[in-house]
Swiss-Prot record:
Superkingdom of source: Eukaryota
Annotated protein name in UniProt: Zinc finger A20 and AN1 domain-containing stress-associated protein 10
Coiled-coil parts of chain: none
Gene name in the database record: SAP10
InterPro entries associated with the record: AN1-like_Znf (IPR035896), AN1_A20_ZnFinger (IPR050652), Znf_A20 (IPR002653), Znf_AN1 (IPR000058)
Source organism: Oryza sativa subsp. japonica
Induction, per UniProt: By dehydration and salt stress.
Zinc fingers (A20-type), renumbered ranges: 12-46
Length: 152
């Protein structure tokens, strides 16, 4: 047997070479092409063509540089068209990972306080939340004193 015949016998006898002539075997599912030639033949999406060719400057989207204010038209007014200018959203603060008292990095061992600070194991918040809670309850619930009843 010739070496070419052995390959055909192992592959089922019906394996054909790539129609593009690259030397690999093609399949009926890819129109007689190998996988590499089939991928090259398929049309690429437009957003991938520009980046593959190096023309990213031409296909890049136009970005608005100034996003400091948003203008929204308000058509609810009877007299005329008004505009409302809204401020940009507040900046996002990073997660606090240092002790508020000693500025030592606490990582996962730190514990947050209701005041918004982070503390290490050696320090704690100086604010007395128990006393503040007692004062708030006393302020919102005044003491009601009933007058004494006269005995008959």
């Amino acid at each position: 047997m010739a070496p070419g015949n052995e390959m055909q016998a192992r592959n089922g006898g019906g394996a054909a070479m790539c129609a593009a002539g690259c030397g690999f075997f093609g399949s009926a599912a890819t129109d007689g092409l190998c996988s590499k030639c089939y991928k090259q033949q398929q049309p690429q999406p437009r957003h991938l063509i520009g980046t593959a060719a190096g023309d990213s400057d031409k296909t890049s989207l136009k970005v608005v540089a100034d996003l400091s204010t948003l203008v929204i038209k308000d058509n609810s007014g009877v007299g005329g068209e008004g505009t409302t200018v809204m401020a940009p959203p507040a900046t996002v603060t990073k997660a606090k990972n240092r002790c508020k008292a000693c500025r030592k990095k606490v990582g996962l061992l730190g514990f947050p306080c209701r005041c918004g600070g982070m503390f290490c194991g050696a320090h704690a918040c100086a604010f007395d939340y128990k006393a503040a809670g007692r004062e708030a309850i006393a302020r919102h619930n005044p003491l009601v004193v009933a007058p004494k009843i006269n005995k008959i």
